[in-house]
């Protein structure tokens, strides 16, 4: 394994100072979970310097999380198994220390951070750790952590009233109040909108640079790694491949891609233009491309015609609908000027699958007031459409999906699916028409095997040829070898495929997916995206709620932008990302390739790196 050279480590501490020692030292570590026949961690040797900002990357199943759980003793003290080798944190052998003892040295924010919030108010949550450790200064620690993360104004809020980004910062403050030497954050941006994701990383950088805390993130988003990390550990098959400074790691972007971590578009495109070292951000990439970019794309074709071999996207993809014209419902009132719609030939509209008319919905606050989430919503969802719901955390995406399933009914207005008013049928009956796949896939596994979970609905409905249908779906989602495994034991990508199988087994007209690509490596993400693209043969209409703007750019035929309880814009992906005033208003961040293209002033706007390469000379591409 290649390691970070001494010149890239933080400045050395004075001679004899314990701070000169690495904060984490892993030696010949192997670990095997009970009931498995192979080691999850294999002969790991790793050193992390005090004060570093480390990104641990690798494909799903590469043991990133298992490795990091050895740092705070969860492995082997909670997740037991065959443990060999040693892990020292701040000079302490984790084998000889309890998880409680280690928690004051290593703070851990889990991927599912909501499960860490155990107290009713923000102040109580952040004070919980230092108070239970008996620290007399627990009030000072609490106030300090809240101030450092910029959430002191939330101290008296109930945790269930917070947005996803705010909840994540509270979980981080709770571990920060113990003043650890190390903070580990598992998938810090997986469930956040792009603007809040960046805020989390900015806060982590402050803690690292201002307070000297060693920060370790487990991450799939290489764009954040390139901008914020100092060093990168690439994991594969249970062991580090290398540990390198971030610039060297990005220069070896082929290594990253080979292990399921795609290089940021800034890296890949600047490398194609011959930049050495590669660019790590949008301005640097635009500067590298500007001297070679052409005045128009190579082989420019009429709108809608793709270059040979280019992957179809949006409305061009199989089953995609004609692009919807721009409809700004509240944009002018909100200060967003609508873009002029291109003239389109009149066409027979596709059959309506679901409608919402005058829909208003909200939730009661603790104080008893009604907090409106959706207000006077009118929508038609049509056959053949692939719809992306986008907006900030709390914009109402999940509420809209639950209304379509009948899990909740609107406080005013009507929702119909296949002509059925959801107020007149139970959610169980509506499941014959609409399937909803949860944001957290593990919540959908009720049985002991994937096969049983997929067969639960068709067997329960006594569907003819249920067994044959189940076997076909298992093959379609690529889980034949894992069909007899418990779904909860699968990797993130495998769980997503399994839940997609559960949804397809219901044979719905309308398929709803909540954040289907969150926490997935590039291979798993591409697998899920490809399966979504193939849904036209099985599902009449698919709706995805997502913060993944790459998925929006490559999959969607129609984008509904939710903001303050209304549809702010109803547009195609290209129209959305071509309008900086709209994305800024809704705190959306276009894919990195589109942002580079905006810097270069390219028109029509490329949405992906593949599209942007068409603007480069053939010898550069």
Write out the residue ranges for each language-model feature.
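ABC ATPase nucleotide-binding domains
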Residues: 256-352, 582-621
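Conserved ABC ATPase "signature" region
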Residues: 137-154, 354, 464-482
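ABC ATPase C-loop
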Residues: 176, 503-504
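Catalytic Walker B motif of ABC-type/P-loop ATPase nucleotide-binding domains
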Residues: 183-186, 511-514
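Conserved ABC ATPase "signature" C-loop
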Residues: 237-238, 565
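Helix-to-loop junction immediately C-terminal to a conserved catalytic motif
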Residues: 72, 405
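Conserved ABC ATPase signature
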Residues: 158-162, 166, 486-490
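Conserved ABC transporter NBD signature motif
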Residues: 80-92, 413-421, 430
């Amino acid at each position: 394994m290649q390691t970070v050279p001494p010149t890239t480590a933080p400045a050395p501490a004075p001679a004899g100072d314990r701070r000169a020692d690495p904060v984490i030292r892993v030696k010949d570590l192997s670990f095997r979970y009970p009931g498995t026949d192979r080691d999850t961690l294999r002969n790991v040797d790793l050193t992390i310097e005090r004060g570093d900002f480390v990104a641990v990357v690798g494909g799903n199943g590469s043991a990133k999380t298992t490795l990091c759980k050895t740092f705070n003793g969860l492995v082997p003290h909670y997740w037991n198994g065959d443990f060999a080798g040693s892990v020292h944190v701040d000079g302490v052998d984790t084998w000889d220390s309890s998880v409680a003892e280690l928690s004051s040295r290593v703070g851990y924010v889990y991927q599912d951070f909501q499960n860490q919030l155990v107290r009713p108010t923000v102040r109580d949550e952040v004070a919980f750790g230092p108070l239970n450790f008996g620290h007399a200064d627990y009030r000072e620690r609490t106030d300090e952590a809240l101030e450092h993360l910029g959430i002191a104004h939330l101290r008296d809020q109930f945790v269930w009233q917070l947005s996803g980004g705010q909840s994540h910062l509270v979980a981080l403050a709770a571990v920060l109040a113990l003043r650890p030497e190390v903070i580990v954050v598992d998938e810090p941006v997986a469930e956040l909108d792009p603007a809040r994701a960046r805020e989390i990383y900015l806060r982590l950088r402050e803690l690292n640079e201002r307070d000297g805390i060693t920060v370790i993130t487990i991450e799939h988003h290489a764009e954040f790694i390139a901008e914020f990390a100092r060093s990168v550990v690439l994991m594969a098959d249970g062991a580090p491949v290398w540990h390198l400074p971030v610039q060297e790691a990005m220069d070896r972007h082929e290594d990253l891609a080979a292990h399921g971590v795609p290089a940021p578009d800034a890296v890949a495109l600047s490398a194609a233009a011959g930049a050495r070292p590669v660019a790590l951000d949008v301005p640097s990439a635009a500067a590298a491309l500007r001297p070679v970019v052409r005045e128009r794309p190579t082989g420019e074709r009429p709108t809608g015609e793709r270059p040979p071999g280019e992957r179809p996207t949006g409305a061009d993809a199989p089953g995609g609908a004609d692009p919807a014209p721009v409809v700004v419902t509240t944009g002018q009132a909100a200060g967003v000027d609508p873009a002029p719609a291109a003239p389109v030939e009149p066409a027979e509209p596709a059959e309506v699958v679901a409608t919402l008319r005058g829909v208003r919905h909200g939730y009661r606050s603790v104080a008893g007031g009604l907090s409106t989430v959706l207000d006077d919503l009118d929508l038609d969802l049509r056959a053949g459409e692939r719809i992306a719901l986008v907006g900030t955390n709390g914009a109402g995406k999940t509420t809209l999906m639950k209304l379509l399933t009948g899990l909740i009914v609107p406080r005013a207005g009507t929702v119909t699916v296949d002509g059925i008013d959801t107020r007149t049928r139970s959610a169980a009956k509506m499941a014959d028409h609409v399937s909803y796949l949860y944001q957290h896939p593990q919540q959908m596994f009720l049985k002991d095997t994937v096969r049983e979970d997929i067969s639960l609905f068709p067997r329960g409905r006594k569907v003819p040829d249920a067994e044959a249908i189940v076997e076909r779906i298992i093959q379609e989602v690529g889980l034949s070898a894992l069909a007899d495994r418990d779904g909860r034991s699968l990797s993130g990508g495998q769980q997503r495929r399994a839940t997609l199988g559960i949804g397809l087994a219901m044979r719905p007209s309308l398929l709803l997916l909540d954040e289907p690509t969150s926490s997935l490596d590039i291979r798993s993400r591409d697998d899920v995206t490809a399966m979504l693209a193939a849904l036209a043969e099985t599902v009449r209409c698919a709706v995805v709620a997502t913060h993944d703007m790459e998925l929006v750019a490559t999959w969607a035929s129609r984008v509904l932008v939710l903001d303050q309880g209304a549809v702010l814009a109803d547009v195609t992906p290209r129209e959305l990302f071509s309008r900086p005033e709209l994305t800024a208003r809704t705190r959306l961040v276009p894919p990195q390739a589109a942002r580079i293209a905006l810097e270069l002033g390219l028109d029509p706007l490329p949405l992906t790196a593949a599209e942007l390469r068409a603007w480069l000379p053939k010898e550069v591409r």
